[in-house]
Amino acid sequence: MADQRKAALDNALRKIEKNFGKGSIMRMGDAADTKIATISSGSLAIDEALGVGGYPRGRIIEMYGPESSGKTTVALHAVAEVQRRGGTAAYIDAENALDPQYATALGVQINDLLLSQPDTGEQGLEIADALIASGAVDIVVVDSVAALVPRAEIEGEMGDTHVGLQARLMSQALRKLSGEINKTKTIAIFINQIREKVGVMFGNPETTPGGRALKFYSTIRMEIRRGEQLKNGTDVIGNRAKIKVVKNKVAPPFRKAEVDIMYGEGISKTGELLDMAVEKDLVNKSGAWYSYGNERIGQGRENAKQWFADHEDAMNELMNKVRVAYGMEPDEAPATKEGEPQQETIEEASSDK
C-alpha cells in the first residue's frame, strides 16, 4: 500500500513538472539554502528587533505611524544600506515630499537612486511592478500608501464619494506584486499613515488606509511612534523613536527597539551602539562614566557617543562585537565614505534572481 502511494505521488510530481516546468514543485528541504537572506536596516537596534538581522529579501514590509514619527527616516536608512552594499534602490514618492539634502545626510547616493513621483496610484504601482519584475532592483520604497490616489478620484470632483476605491486598488496590486517580489528577491517597503475610525467606543480606534490587503501580504509590520525630545541644553536636537514589530512571519513578533533620530542626521548609530553595548557589558557604565576596554571614554551619554564618533575603528570593532552578542552575523560590507566608490557585496545574497 505504501509503495502504491509513493508511486502515485511520484507520478503526480512528474505530471506537474511536465505541465508547469521544472521547479514548479519541490520538497522544501531540496532548496539550496533554506536560510532567509536579509539586508541590514542600517540600524543595529532595528536589526535585533526584526529577529533575523535585517529585512528579509523577497518580502513585503509595512511601516506605519503618526506624522513626523520617523517612518521615512527608517526607510531611507534601508535604502542607504542597500546602496552601501552595491545594490540598486528605487523610491516611489507619492507624497512628493522627499528631501534630497536630508536623504544625502542619511547616506543615500541620490545620483544613483531611482525616483518616481507618480500622478496617480495606478501609475505608482505600475512603476513599482515594472521595477520589481526587472529583477535588477534590490529595494523599492512606496511613500506612502495613503497618497496613492486612484485615477477616478483624481479626475473626479472634490465632493464625489469613491467608496473602497483605494482598498480595491491595493488588493489588486498586491495580488500581482507578491509573487514577483518573492521571485526576484526584492524588498518592498510600504510606508503608511494612521487614520481613526469614527464612533469606536472600545478598543483601538486607529487604522491604516488602503484596506486589509497590505496587512495580510506583509511579512513584517512595524509601528513607529515618536518618543521624548533629545536636548542639548535648551536646544532640541532630535527625538527618540519607538519601534514595535507588530507582525513578523520570519521571527517572533512584538519585539521593540528605541533609536535616537537626530535632526538633519537621521538615526544615531553611536547612540544605539552604546545602549546595546552597555546592555551586554561590552561597555562598562559606572555612574555617569562610560569605559571601553581599559579606557574611560566619556562622562555622560552624549560624550561617550561623541568618543565613538571620533574613533571609527573602535566603533566598527564594537559594532561587530554587539552583532555577535545579539546573535547576528558580523557586518562584512565595507564602510564607504561620501564620494568613495561602492563595492559590489550584495550580489551573493541576490544570486537567486
UniProtKB/Swiss-Prot annotation:
A GO biological process held by the record: DNA repair
GO molecular function: ATP binding; ATP hydrolysis activity; ATP-dependent DNA damage sensor activity; damaged DNA binding; single-stranded DNA binding
Pfam family, one: RecA
Primary location recorded for the protein, binned into one broad class: cytoplasm
Keyword terms, alphabetized: ATP-binding, Cytoplasm, DNA damage, DNA recombination, DNA repair, DNA-binding, Nucleotide-binding, SOS response
NCBIfam families: tigrfam_recA
Protein's recorded name: Protein RecA
Protein species of origin: Limosilactobacillus fermentum (strain NBRC 3956 / LMG 18251)
